[in-house]
Amino acid sequence: MSKTYHFIGIKGSGMSALALMLHQMGHKVQGSDVEKYYFTQRGLEQAGITILPFDEKNLDGDMEIIAGNAFRPDNNVEIAYADQNGISYKRYHEFLGSFMRDFVSMGVAGAHGKTSTTGMLSHVLSHITDTSFLIGDGTGRGSANAKYFVFESDEYERHFMPYHPEYSIITNIDFDHPDYFTSLEDVFNAFNDYAKQITKGLFVYGEDAELRKITSDAPIYYYGFEAEGNDFVASDLLRSITGSTFTVHFRGQNLGQFHIPTFGRHNIMNATAVIGLLYTAGFDLNLVREHLKTFAGVKRRFTEKIVNDTVIIDDFAHHPTEIIATLDAARQKYPSKEIVAVFQPHTFTRTIALLDDFAHALNQADAVYLAQIYGSAREVDHGDVKVEDLANKINKKHQVITVENVSPLLDHDNAVYVFMGAGDIQTYEYSFERLLSNLTSNVQ
């Protein structure tokens, strides 16, 4: 008899992916969340998964309850009711740690790029063999017959500590989440603790100084662009408007040429990590090569649309390193167009900690438009930073805009608009799309 799972906070990206995966494995799944629309709920609704408002009546002692990490007794009625009545529940990462023991598990960790890399690994492996996976863009796939399980491994609040995968990629280490981590050293220590839990193979970006200090009982394989000191090396790069082609060598042995239809140097590294892991795990590289060619990307990572001949890119980038990577990808695909960045800072703590870095990253665009800072539910705005503080540090043409008036964005010809952020930047994007549609309607 299949279990019934109830998710408290089912619209969260990891939670929705897990709900979809369990649903596809034949379990009954339901969940609760706020009424505000979030991009993950489309997949849940298409699967026929019930989404309820938060209410203590949703809970049944016979259910297995999985709670989002942000919810506590003081901010959620279901958690409060469960605590008061002795109803047990597991946090997302606690459940995942026990769930993965039944599979050959492959994790993807890192400050940046883990969702794209998890998506790439999941795409390739699931086309080769039966695979279940969880991606941080809200995508999940479950199979009752799967031997392999691919998942995204999140460092925030050390949520990845219950995980003991056979294989893992770590894309990079960078200072982020300043509301939790106190320093780069603190971030490193978290990743190093995680690395010690890998059992068969750890694949790390060899040109990251912090990752060079990582220790693990599992064999460590370094990947990168530089031949010296790396095990898996990407070379002979050909970057074009159709994607990237490159050759991979393993300790001097030519593994052949590969092509990915995605953009930016960071995606070449993501692919090299995937190639290295699957080669080491014994998979046929001809199959890996074949399925890399069809990887189209993940949700909210360089997602493109064209509205009345205007190219709009939506990306989750909310850290300076991610912004630079996204703008690099835009320039690769659209070398003759003006690159216009529309960015919403995410959390006051991150904006304060990385203000100069944000300015440097955004200056890689040709023009910059800023939305008001999106505060996290975990923090209070003490007025220590405003978006104008960031605007004052940007050298390129720049302006602060509101969601009610995005018309300043029209002041560009032959431009690509790159909307970036982890808050509600999509509301600005949709406002701009409506404006473009109305202009066309008026002309017609």
Swiss-Prot record:
Pathway: Cell wall biogenesis; peptidoglycan biosynthesis. It is found in: Cytoplasm. One of its GO terms (molecular function) is ATP binding. It catalyses: UDP-N-acetyl-alpha-D-muramate + L-alanine + ATP = UDP-N-acetyl-alpha-D-muramoyl-L-alanine + ADP + phosphate + H(+). GO terms for cellular component: cytoplasm. ATP binds at G110, A111, H112, G113, K114, T115, S116. One of its GO terms (biological process) is cell wall organization. Phosphorylated by StkP in vitro. Dephosphorylated by PhpP in vitro. Pfam families: Mur_ligase, Mur_ligase_C, Mur_ligase_M. Keywords: ATP-binding, Cell cycle, Cell division, Cell shape, Cell wall biogenesis/degradation, Cytoplasm, Ligase, Nucleotide-binding, Peptidoglycan synthesis, Phosphoprotein. SUPFAM superfamilies: MurCD N-terminal domain, MurD-like peptide ligases, catalytic domain, MurD-like peptide ligases, peptide-binding domain. Its EC number is 6.3.2.8. InterPro entries: Mur-like_cat_sf, Mur_ligase_C, Mur_ligase_C_dom_sf, Mur_ligase_cen, Mur_ligase_N, MurCDEF_pg_biosynth, UDP-N-AcMur_Ala_ligase_MurC. Belongs to the MurCDEF family. This is UDP-N-acetylmuramate--L-alanine ligase. It comes from Streptococcus pneumoniae serotype 4 (strain ATCC BAA-334 / TIGR4). The lineage of its organism: Bacteria, Bacillati, Bacillota, Bacilli, Lactobacillales. The gene is murC.
